[in-house]
A protein has these predicted regions:
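Short, solvent-exposed beta-strand-to-loop segments that form ligand-recognition rims
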Residues: 146-171
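Short tryptophan-centered beta-strand motifs in secreted/extracellular beta-sheet-rich domains
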Residues: 7, 67-69, 129-145
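Extracellular carbohydrate recognition
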Residues: 170-180
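Short, aromatic/His-centered strand-loop micro-motif at the edge of beta-sheets
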Residues: 112-133
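Extracellular glycan-recognition surfaces and repeat-rich motifs
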Residues: 14-43, 48-51
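Extracellular carbohydrate-recognition regions
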Residues: 1-23, 179-180
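Secretory/extracellular carbohydrate-interaction modules
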Residues: 12, 46-112, 171
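Hydrophobic beta-strand positions in extracellular immunoglobulin-like domains
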Residues: 71-73, 138, 183
Length: 188
């Protein structure tokens, strides 16, 4: 497994260096590196409000591989989501897998031409104010999503193909912390 990317060397109150942050749809995302409440380590926090805020690592180009992140849903009246994006071409074209503490489920979507479409969702316990790990393994049309080590979605889909960036994602008014972002190429 690759060494997880942390935000401990990034400036507090700013987006992380080497990442591009924005949103699909309307709104104003607020991606900043902050000191974890009650702790000393720095984490990435999304605290703005937008349809689908995302923040992608600039130097990634994965066709087949895996993406993993630790996320901590803090609050949100509409949503309390944390997710990962991959095969990200731009803010309107990518895959996303997310877990939602308000709905207690894990979902897989493709976003094409700025329109998010559900591929699959499954009920799963997602506690608020707790760190979780979300991982996606993808190779060709195969996509496997796991929450806290348990596979929740395992299917085939071909909506988004070819290499793309990877990063993190939230929804609506979710206030979510992210840490230990990791990624790698698929094995043989």
């Amino acid at each position: 497994m690759a060494e997880p990317i942390t935000f401990d060397r990034d400036a507090v109150g700013q987006p992380p260096a080497g990442w591009t942050c924005g949103a699909t749809g309307k709104g104003t995302p607020q991606w900043t590196v902050e000191t974890e409440p009650g702790g000393t380590r720095r984490v990435l926090k999304q605290s703005g409000r937008a349809a689908f805020p995302w923040c992608v690592k600039n130097d990634i180009a994965l066709t087949d591989g895996w993406v993993e992140v630790r996320f901590h849903p803090i609050s949100g009246r509409e949503d309390q989501a944390g997710g990962v994006v991959w095969r990200w071409k731009d803010g309107d074209n990518y895959y996303v897998a997310r877990a939602n503490a308000l709905e207690n489920n894990v979902s897989l979507y493709h976003t094409t031409a700025g329109s998010r479409q559900t591929i699959e969702y499954r009920d799963a316990p997602v506690a608020k104010n707790v760190w979780h790990t979300l991982r996606v393994d993808f190779k060709g049309a195969s996509i496997r999503v796991a929450l806290d080590g348990k596979v929740t979605i395992d299917l085939q889909d071909t909506h988004i193909q070819g290499a793309g960036k990877a990063g993190v994602w939230t929804k609506a008014d979710s206030v979510t912390l992210f840490d230990a972002f990791a990624y790698g190429n698929a094995g043989p």
